[in-house]
A protein has these predicted regions:
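Basic/polar N-terminal segments that are highly enriched at the extreme N-terminus
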Residues: 1-4
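An anion-binding catalytic pocket shared by soluble metabolic enzymes
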Residues: 7-92
């Protein structure tokens, strides 16, 4: 699956978690793109109920923005730290 496919899957997860009331009012969802040093993360400004793949941000394992139109959320460092230290983890 390519990056766009992973962005769609991650956005779908955001919508499903919101629809099923399985996520708190704040917080971010992220996913590691398998075989890469890229992480897809939900931006603070986007609604989890309506988010689509174009809304998702892509950062590297240092938290540097690679793709997207807004700054990564302040919690990005927590997500990427988990991915750096736990290669087996694919989502947070």
């Amino acid at each position: 699956m390519d990056l766009e496919g992973w962005k769609e899957k991650t956005a779908l997860c955001c919508r499903l978690l919101q629809m099923e009331s399985l996520i708190e009012a704040s917080g971010h969802i992220s996913a590691r793109v398998p075989g890469t040093d890229q992480v897809i993360i939900h931006p603070m400004q986007a609604s989890r109920a309506t988010i689509g793949p174009r809304d998702m941000l892509v950062v590297d394992l240092e938290g540097k923005l690679l793709e997207g139109e807004v700054a990564p959320p302040s919690e990005t460092h927590i997500h990427v730290s988990i991915y750096r230290h736990r290669p087996d983890v694919l989502s947070v």
